[in-house]
C-alpha cells in the first residue's frame, strides 16, 4: 500500500529531524550551564639565535 509507505517514510523523517533538533538543543543548554572553560593562550617564545 503506497499510502502506508509514504506515511512511514514521513514519520521516520520527522522523527530523525526531531531527534537531531532536540540533541542540538540539549548540547546548547549543557554548554551554557556547564562551568566556563578557561583557555590560556600559549606562551609564544620567539626562538633566539644561537650566536646571542
Swiss-Prot record:
Compartment(s) where it occurs, according to its Swiss-Prot or TrEMBL record: Mitochondrion membrane
Recorded coiled-coil stretches: none
Membrane topology designation: Single-pass membrane protein
TM stretches of this protein: 10-30
Keywords on record: ATP synthesis, CF(0), Hydrogen ion transport, Ion transport, Membrane, Mitochondrion, Transmembrane, Transmembrane helix, Transport
Gene Ontology cellular component list: mitochondrial membrane; proton-transporting ATP synthase complex
Gene Ontology terms describing biological process: ATP biosynthetic process; proton transmembrane transport
Broad class of the protein's primary localization: mitochondrion
General function of this protein: Subunit 8, of the mitochondrial membrane ATP synthase complex (F(1)F(0) ATP synthase or Complex V) that produces ATP from ADP in the presence of a proton gradient across the membrane which is generated by electron transport complexes of the respiratory chain. ATP synthase complex consist of a soluble F(1) head domain - the catalytic core - and a membrane F(1) domain - the membrane proton channel. These two domains are linked by a central stalk rotating inside the F(1) region and a stationary peripheral stalk.
Family (UniProt): Belongs to the ATPase protein 8 family.
Subunit field text: Component of the ATP synthase complex composed at least of ATP5F1A/subunit alpha, ATP5F1B/subunit beta, ATP5MC1/subunit c (homooctomer), MT-ATP6/subunit a, MT-ATP8/subunit 8, ATP5ME/subunit e, ATP5MF/subunit f, ATP5MG/subunit g, ATP5MK/subunit k, ATP5MJ/subunit j, ATP5F1C/subunit gamma, ATP5F1D/subunit delta, ATP5F1E/subunit epsilon, ATP5PF/subunit F6, ATP5PB/subunit b, ATP5PD/subunit d, ATP5PO/subunit OSCP.
Name of the molecule in the record: ATP synthase F(0) complex subunit 8
Organism: Lycodon semicarinatus (Ryukyu odd-tooth snake)
